Every structure is written in C-alpha cells, then in structure tokens.
C-alpha cells in the first residue's frame, strides 16, 4: 500500500511533463491514466498514448522534492482529473496514502481528498530497449535540428512516411536530417564530435515536437537508444519513448539542385516582414500566392486580390546576381523557412519560374538548406 509525502509543486511539474504523453480521448481507456510507481529509490510517473510514452523519475535524493517514502506500490489514476486535484491543493506539502486497494487519500494543509484508482497490472508494459551504446547529443543541438526540420514534414496521413523526419547517420559521424511534405523540404547536415553506430530512422514529427517541449534546456545531454520499431531519448530523470515510422523514406538528394540562374541575398527579418504583409492579402486570393519579380537588380513582391486589394512592395536586398525572373509561391512556406533560420542573412537561389528554389543561411557556415516548390500561375 503506497504511502509517501512530496513537495506539491515539484510533483505537479513532473505530472504535467508526463501528461504530454497522455490523451484523454484515447481509444484504449486505460491510456488516459497516469501510472504512479513507488520504489525505494523514488517515484516514477508513467504516461503513454500508444505512440509516445514518458517515464519521469523523482529521486529520493532530490532535495527539492522533499520526498519521504513510507511504503511502496503502484496505482493508476485518471490523469487530467488527478492533476487538477493536485494543483488545487492548498499547502506546499502533499501526503499521498493508499488506504485500501486502489483507493488513495491526498492530504495537504487542512484539505483531505479521497480518490479511486485502478489496478496498475492493467497498464500495458513499455517495450524494453536494450541499453547498447547510446548516441549522446547536446539537448540544445538536437532541439535546434528539430526546429530547423520538423516544420517541413507533412501533416497529411495519406503518405505516413512524410509525417516524419528522416535521421541518417553514415560513416559513424555524418548526421543528415530531412523533412518534406513534397511542396517544401528542409535538410540539416552536421558532423558529430564522437563516432557512433550508423542508423537510418524516420521519427514522427509530432513526437519530436513533444520531445522539444519535455526536454528543457537545463537538461544538458540526451542519450538516444534504438530498437526495431522505436527509439528512446533518455536523460537522468526522463525517458521518452516514441514509435518509429515504417517504410522507406524517399530519396531526397536527387531533388536538390546545384546550378542556378538567379541568386539574391536578403536580410531575414526584412524579407519575413514583407512576406507577412503580402500574406495578409494573398490569403484572400484563389491560389494564395505571392509573385516575386526580379528585374534589373530590383526585387519586388506583388499580390492582387480582386476582392480585397493589392500589394506592391520593393524589397531591400544585399546582393542580386543573374537573370531576371518572375516566380509565384505560397508565402507561408517562405515565412516558415525564414523562422527556422538562425542567421541574419539568407541567400535564395532560383533556376526558373517552375523549378524549386533553395534557401541557405548567408552568414554562417552551417550546412542547412531548404527547398520550396513554386506555384504555376496563368
């Protein structure tokens, strides 16, 4: 029969992290619960939605937790309801006691709340991942890679493989990450400091965004373990499991052009603001596009909406080389790409009005490239 006391605020923080893996609308009702597992070492909170699972460990050695364990055990509690109850408690200390099989009393200050739980044996087991040699990355670096690529993944389930980000490690240290929804593509390459075993996996972009929310910047490094159909990201206290997407990711290398006819360097903030102004009107047009015109070294953006009005704006540039060109595209794709850049300047290179164009940071030596497909207009 479980009995422990803990700092309420730290417990609530840990519950909210674990809750990110829990869906109240799950087809499997037991997955709307949080599993609380109490051992001599500490308290583990477990949540899962079948796609991702989070185990969050609060150690007895963590002084901030003020954790006192009297007796051990495990129980399931309805996650959202339990978290609301805990957050409403008046005092900074919370006493958690199982009074009879799967029934608990929470005591805090002068408040005492009794809750019914469920037998923890009903909870599905998380597949073990063998602790082979992990890939170790800085958390900030991995989150940066996710920020630079995951947005370009598809949100359509018609081609499930494209809803993921393709991570490939070759020659033991060359990491390439790619995401595409077939209208745009984002690719980041870098060389790791330490050798690791090669891998080729497709991780759901939704899982990666959750990873970024769960692993805060104060967690310095993350260990990554691979199994047949899932991957584990682990820090000292958090284990984050996600299923991998099955199937072969398309060969994206052949999509990336190398020769261009027109190249322009822009200030990222200026270009983004211009595109956001253009998008206000383009969203009211039939095809939602903005037309970019490059003529005699001058670059201008145009949108014409019969219902709303029009935009004509000359855009400041740092450098323009090559041929004149008129090209139309979805401004949201360009805005998203510019948001993912960590540079002040961007170089955009064009081949023709109907071929994809590329964006690369102009003032850093990062190997980061994005591709956007234009829209054919009359």
From Swiss-Prot:
CDD domains (alphabetical): beta_clamp (cd00140)
The protein's role, per its UniProt record: Confers DNA tethering and processivity to DNA polymerases and other proteins. Acts as a clamp, forming a ring around DNA (a reaction catalyzed by the clamp-loading complex) which diffuses in an ATP-independent manner freely and bidirectionally along dsDNA. Initially characterized for its ability to contact the catalytic subunit of DNA polymerase III (Pol III), a complex, multichain enzyme responsible for most of the replicative synthesis in bacteria; Pol III exhibits 3'-5' exonuclease proofreading activity.
Lineage: Bacteria, Bacillati, Bacillota, Bacilli, Lactobacillales
The name this protein goes by in its record: Beta sliding clamp
PANTHER family in alphabetical order: BETA SLIDING CLAMP, DNA POLYMERASE III SUBUNIT BETA
Localization per Swiss-Prot or TrEMBL: Cytoplasm
Subunit structure: Forms a ring-shaped head-to-tail homodimer around DNA which binds and tethers DNA polymerases and other proteins to the DNA. The DNA replisome complex has a single clamp-loading complex (3 tau and 1 each of delta, delta', psi and chi subunits) which binds 3 Pol III cores (1 core on the leading strand and 2 on the lagging strand) each with a beta sliding clamp dimer. Additional proteins in the replisome are other copies of gamma, psi and chi, Ssb, DNA helicase and RNA primase.
Keywords: Cytoplasm, DNA replication, DNA-binding, DNA-directed DNA polymerase, Nucleotidyltransferase, Transferase
A Pfam family recorded for this sequence: DNA_pol3_beta_3
Principal location listed in the UniProt entry: cytoplasm
Source organism (scientific name): Streptococcus pneumoniae (strain ATCC BAA-255 / R6)
Domain of life, per lineage: Bacteria
GO cellular component: cytoplasm; DNA polymerase III complex
Entry GO MF terms: 3'-5' exonuclease activity; DNA binding; DNA-directed DNA polymerase activity
Alphabetical GO biological process terms: DNA strand elongation involved in DNA replication
Assigned protein family: Belongs to the beta sliding clamp family.
